[in-house]
């Protein structure tokens, strides 16, 4: 995990095409404020990443007069005693909203909460926790049903899926990378030399298909993040093109004459790059080397996640928050949140009598 704070200004040659972790923390805090949740538990990974994420959330919600019911940490390799402590804290707390800035290390906690019958909690999680949904753990899904997740906006690279589906070792026999890719995906050995099998690996038949429904490669985690790489490549290409056009009156920088090319020159053009990508989105870098932030909000509906909104960031912070309230399902599968809010209001009155 990267650091939470924006350190791009300390590293002027560092650029990011994915939203910083700080934006996710700000997004989680904004959801707490948006739904007027005023009695919240905070749970973070016991690391710099987790501590900074929780710190950002705490700072933001306290500004809006919300209260932190409890705050706890989970080691990346949680021990039974850590799990029991956190489960006890959650079970005994009156807070029904938990902001979690951690990953799969929270899974044992969810399982024990399920086994102890601790229900009715609304979890707000960052992208790190999304790996849990891939594990298809029934107990975890039961506990997280009705929760919200904030993740970096993902898009598909136009034409990439079709391009990958057309890949085949036999159509590009000179390309060793495709052969290796094929072998890795299908766990077989593409034999081009007529030699014998090695390591007892089975031969690839050539009949394997990336699109036959039995292969999960195209839905693997990270495949839908390819657009971030796409933006990075295009940003570099635009910067290089702008530099070539601008410097064309000076020394030649291509061919055998490269005396006019200096990396720091390209860096200057990369800082100023501004274009629209194939999704129609503006691409440019701020003073920290970050792109304009865009986060998707997902609601966990039993064993699936449903898109319910987005958070758009501008230079000065959150620019726009969209939430489709009619698509929301809360803990227990209800589209109504009134009981949860009522309980939270009772807790708020107990915490701040007379207000």
Residues of each region from the PLM?
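Extracellular ectodomain signature
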Residues: 1, 10, 18-38, 44-53, ...
């Amino acid at each position: 995990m990267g650091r939470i704070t924006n350190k791009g200004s300390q590293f002027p040659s560092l650029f990011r095409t994915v939203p910083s972790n700080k934006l996710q923390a700000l997004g989680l805090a904004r959801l707490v404020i948006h739904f007027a949740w005023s009695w919240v538990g905070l749970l973070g990974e016991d690391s710099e990443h987790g501590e900074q994420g929780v710190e950002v959330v705490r700072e933001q919600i306290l500004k809006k007069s919300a209260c932190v019911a409890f705050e706890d940490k989970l080691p990346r390799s949680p021990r039974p005693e850590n799990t029991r402590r956190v489960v006890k804290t959650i079970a005994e707390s009156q807070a029904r909203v938990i902001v979690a800035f951690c990953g799969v290390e929270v899974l044992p906690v969810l399982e024990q909460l399920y086994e102890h019958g601790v229900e009715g909690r609304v979890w707000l999680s960052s992208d790190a926790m999304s790996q849990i949904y891939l594990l298809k753990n029934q107990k975890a899904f039961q506990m997280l049903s009705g929760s919200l997740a904030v993740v970096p906006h993902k898009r598909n690279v136009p034409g990439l899926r079709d391009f990958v589906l057309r890949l085949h070792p036999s159509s590009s026999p000179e390309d060793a990378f495709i052969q290796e890719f094929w072998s890795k995906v299908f766990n077989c050995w593409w034999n081009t030399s007529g030699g014998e099998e090695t390591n007892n690996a089975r031969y690839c038949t050539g009949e394997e298909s990336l699109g036959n429904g039995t292969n999960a490669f195209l839905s693997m985690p990270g495949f839908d993040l390819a657009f971030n790489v796409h933006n990075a490549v295009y940003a570099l290409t635009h910067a290089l093109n702008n530099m070539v056009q601008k410097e064309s009156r000076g020394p030649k920088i291509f061919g055998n004459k490269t005396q006019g090319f200096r990396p720091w020159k390209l860096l200057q053009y990369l800082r100023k790059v501004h274009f629209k990508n194939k999704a129609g989105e503006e691409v440019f870098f701020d003073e920290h080397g970050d792109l304009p932030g865009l986060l998707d909000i997902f609601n966990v509906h039993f064993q699936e996640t449903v898109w319910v909104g987005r958070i758009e960031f501008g230079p000065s912070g959150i620019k726009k928050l969209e939430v489709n309230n009619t698509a929301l399902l809360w803990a227990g599968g209800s589209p109504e949140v009134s009981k949860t809010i009522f309980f939270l209001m009772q807790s708020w009155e107990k915490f701040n009598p007379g207000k």
